[in-house]
């Protein structure tokens, strides 16, 4: 048996060295983006969302067709701003119920698989909540902008033109701000309740209670009724930048406050 001293190591003839481990970059907001994208597409495919967009679009087309026939048969001049304000009132009142249902099912509808399938895969509760909130908010705002564009375009071409493009865009933005608050409150309720029906019921109770409180506030506060009263003038272009800023600040503050409360309670809730 050869001694250890007599063992000669042969030179390395072309043997490849061990490859260096690849640098893996971790994007901390990638789970949030995945949840937001999946939820956004899920809302677009839901029958409640499609029914909402279809019903409102058909209502607008039917109303414009009737008004157009009335104008050509009876020669009655109908300002577009009056027709649009009636349409937008109906859109907002009718949309609150369906939008509330869509928002209330953001988290409550996935309680059965929430802990095992989602929160155990490297995503925090805050990221999950933000992804759900922004996904629902983006889908609702997209649908509202589409319906608003249909209403403004139809009114300008079919009825007596007294609506400006800037006024129409501002009116859609102001009404969209109110829907954004409803969506934010709905997602907050969805994080607190285990069932979508309970979350939707709690949301409607909260909205009715808020309506009572809004009635006692000063007229300078941009409540939903205040916004609806200003819309006819906004459609004609009679608005100021301060008015839009005021609505955006109040609506944005309500959205952020509801999101903070929802994330705080959701992070401490046993699921």
Residue ranges and their predicted role:
Residues 23, 49, 56-106, 129-203, ...:
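Secretory targeting signals
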Residues 2-11, 253-271:
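Junction motif at the cytosolic side of a transmembrane helix
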Residues 42, 109, 121, 152-156, ...:
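Transmembrane helix-loop junction
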Residues 2-54:
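Aromatic- and glycine-rich beta-strand/loop motifs that create alpha-glucan
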Residues 126-130, 266:
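Alpha-helix N-cap/helix-start motif at helix boundaries, enriched for small hydrophobics
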Residues 118-125:
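Short helix-to-coil transition segments within interhelical loops
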Residues 31-34, 218-237:
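Short hydrophobic, aromatic-rich alpha-helical segments embedded in or entering the lipid bilayer
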């Amino acid at each position: 048996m050869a001694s250890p001293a007599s063992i000669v190591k042969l030179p390395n003839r072309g043997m490849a060295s061990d490859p260096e481990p690849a640098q893996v970059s971790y994007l901390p907001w990638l789970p949030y983006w995945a949840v937001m994208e999946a939820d956004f597409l899920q809302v677009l495919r839901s029958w409640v969302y499609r029914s909402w967009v279809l019903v409102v679009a058909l209502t607008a087309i039917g109303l414009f067709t009737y008004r157009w026939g009335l104008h050509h048969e009876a020669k009655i001049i109908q300002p577009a701003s009056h027709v649009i304000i009636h349409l937008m009132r109906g859109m907002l009142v009718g949309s609150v119920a369906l939008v509330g249902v869509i928002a209330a099912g953001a988290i409550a509808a996935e309680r059965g698989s929430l802990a095992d399938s989602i929160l155990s895969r490297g995503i925090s509760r805050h990221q999950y909540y933000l992804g759900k909130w922004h996904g629902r908010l983006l889908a609702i705002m997209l649908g509202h902008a589409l319906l608003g564009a249909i209403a403004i375009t139809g009114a300008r071409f079919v009825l007596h033109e007294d609506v400006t493009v800037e006024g129409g865009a501002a009116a859609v933005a102001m009404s969209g701000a109110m829907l954004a608050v409803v969506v934010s409150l709905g997602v907050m309720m969805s994080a607190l309740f285990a069932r979508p029906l309970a979350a939707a019921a709690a949301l409607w109770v909260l909205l009715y209670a808020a309506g009572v409180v809004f009635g006692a506030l000063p007229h300078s506060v941009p409540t939903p009724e205040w916004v609806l009263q200003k819309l006819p003038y906004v459609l004609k272009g009679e608005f100021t930048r301060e008015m839009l800023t005021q609505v955006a600040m109040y609506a944005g503050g309500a959205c952020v406050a509801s999101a903070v409360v929802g994330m705080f309670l959701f992070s401490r809730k046993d699921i």
